[in-house]
Design a protein with these regions (language model features):
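Conserved catalytic core of Hanks-type protein kinase domains
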Residues: 128
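A helicase ATPase "motif cassette" and its flanking acidic/Ser/Thr-rich regulatory loops
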Residues: 94
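N-terminal accessory segment detector
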Residues: 1-91, 100-117, 131-147, 153-175
Length: 175
C-alpha cells in the first residue's frame, strides 16, 4: 500500500516535467529542452526541500537547526524512507533509501532529469554556506544506491565537511 502511494505521488509530480521535456525536445532539441525543464525542476525541488531544510537565522545555533531538520526529515519518513545515520553536536547525517520522484523519472524514460530533481539541496546549501556546510556522496538520481545528506556546523572539523563538496562535478549546466 505504501509503495503504491509513493508510486502515485512520484509519478503525478514528475509527469508534467516529463511531458514538457518530450514536447520541448521535438520543438527545440533535447539539449535546450533539458536546460529549460531542468531549471524548472530544480526550482520546484528547492521549493519542496524548503519545507524540510529549515531557515537558520543569524541568532540560531546549529543545534537548533539540527533539531528542526531532524524533525522535518522524520515527518517525510513514509515518503522517502529516511534514516538518521549519525549525529553529534556538529553534524547530522541522513540516509534516504527511497525517492519516488527519481524513480518516476527513470520509469518515464527521462533519467537525465534526475540530476535536476536532486539539485535542490545543493542550491539551498549554496545559499546557506555562511551558516552551515553540506555534503552528499550518493544520490538516487546519479548512482541510485541511496541519498546521503550530511549537514555540518561551520565549526565542524570532520574531513567530509570540506566546502568543496557543495559542488557536484557532474553538473556542467547552469541552473
Amino acid at each position: 500500500m505504501l509503495n503504491t502511494l509513493r508510486w502515485i505521488i512520484g509519478h503525478a509530480a514528475m509527469m508534467p516535467f516529463t511531458f514538457s521535456y518530450f514536447a520541448l525536445s521535438v520543438l527545440l532539441g533535447r539539449r535546450k529542452a533539458l536546460s529549460l525543464v531542468g531549471k524548472a525542476l530544480s526550482n520546484v525541488s528547492v521549493m519542496s526541500l524548503g519545507t524540510i531544510i529549515p531557515e537558520m537565522h543569524n541568532n540560531d545555533s546549529f543545534s537548533d537547526f539540527k533539531s528542526r531538520i531532524i524533525r522535518n526529515f522524520s515527518s517525510y519518513k513514509l515518503l522517502y524512507d529516511v534514516e538518521i545515520q549519525s549525529e553529534s553536536n556538529e553534524f547530522a547525517e541522513f540516509k534516504v533509501l527511497n525517492c519516488p520522484f527519481t524513480s518516476a523519472l527513470r520509469n518515464f524514460g527521462t533519467p537525465e532529469l534526475c540530476r535536476f530533481a536532486c539539485a535542490g539541496d545543493f542550491i539551498i546549501a549554496k545559499r546557506n554556506r555562511s551558516r552551515w556546510k553540506f555534503s552528499r556522496t550518493h544520490s538516487h538520481g546519479t548512482d541510485g544506491i541511496c541519498c546521503n545528506h550530511t549537514y555540518f556546523s561551520l565549526d565542524c572539523k570532520r574531513e567530509e565537511s570540506v566546502d568543496g563538496k557543495i559542488e557536484r562535478p557532474e553538473e556542467k549546466e547552469r541552473y
